[in-house]
Amino acid sequence: MPKLSFFQTPSTGGWGARTGAPATTTGTGAARVSGEQDMEVTPGPSDSVSAMAFSPTADMLAVASWDTYVRIYRIDKTNAQPVQPYQQYQHEGPVLDVCFNAEGNKVISGGADKVARCFDLNTNQPAVVAQHNEPIRCVRWLRAFGGALVTGSWDKTVKIWKIEPQPTLITSLDVPERVYAMDTIGLIIIVATAERKIVAFQCNEATGTAQQVAALDSPLKYQTRCIAALPEGDGFALGGTEGRVAVHYFHDPPDPKDGRMKKFAFRCHRRANADHPDVPRTETLLYPVNAIVFNSQGTFATGGGDGSISFWCKASRTRLKSTYFY
């Protein structure tokens, strides 16, 4: 059974903190996490965790798993006892993604059963709120249209839904390939698909539609693992299977002073021989970048398959800190 725990450290502000809290860092080196301050989850999911989402309004965490369940945990930082599921509900196949609505009173998940389900934390009842012809890979909450659900599927469509009072499809958008990753900010939806394609849509609340505003090939050479919208909504950060991140802008003319552009890419989540005893001296292990998250100040964190989380400053293009969990 996979082990799931909440790691507690002195607050670093913007990471998981309330909106507007300042982000701080403690150095540029790498630290290895001990288990002394973990809050263990018992029981944890019985299969791999596919996605997690924190509530925007409370100390709650939703966890989607390949064992077909979504588990919702209420975190009490004053209680040292193991954290147990507060609520849970089930899909008819592996659950691939999960999110909260803006008010934090609903958990929405999508999965291999081709539907999105909404669990109402006020009534403790799940309901189907969206459907596709193939598995739903991504779910995100959109603040446009008075609050709406966005679903991205392997059927090569992205759909926007009103889920109250009854589930209603607002619009369906075609994308070039199967949806692999997705994010939203303001009126913007950014989608990464198979075959290294990136598309962006801007919602029009007056007409109830969304128009494509960007279409490009990924700046990375290999398969996309994750994507995150920049806080200003003018671009995105993209993580790939080759241990590399690209920060890209929709409009990026050369600076008239030096000809430089704002976009950049960098290597991360890689281990050379000195870091890993199983790697030959002349080789480096490349790990996928599985998650990217920004705080409101523009610094961001990446989580990699090497078991580490790294913190980065977008403005100075530098790494602030890395933490290894195993």
PLM segments and residue spans:
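Short coil/turn segments within WD40 beta-propeller repeats
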Residues: 47-50, 59, 67-71, 93-96, ...
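A short helix->beta-strand "capping" segment at the edge of beta-propeller domains
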Residues: 6-10, 18-47, 81-83, 263-267
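WD40/WD-repeat beta-propeller blade N-cap
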Residues: 42-49, 88-95, 130-137, 173-179, ...
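Blade-loop segments of beta-propeller domains
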Residues: 81-107, 124-134
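Conserved beta-strand element within WD40/beta-propeller blades
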Residues: 61-65, 107-111, 149-153, 189-193, ...
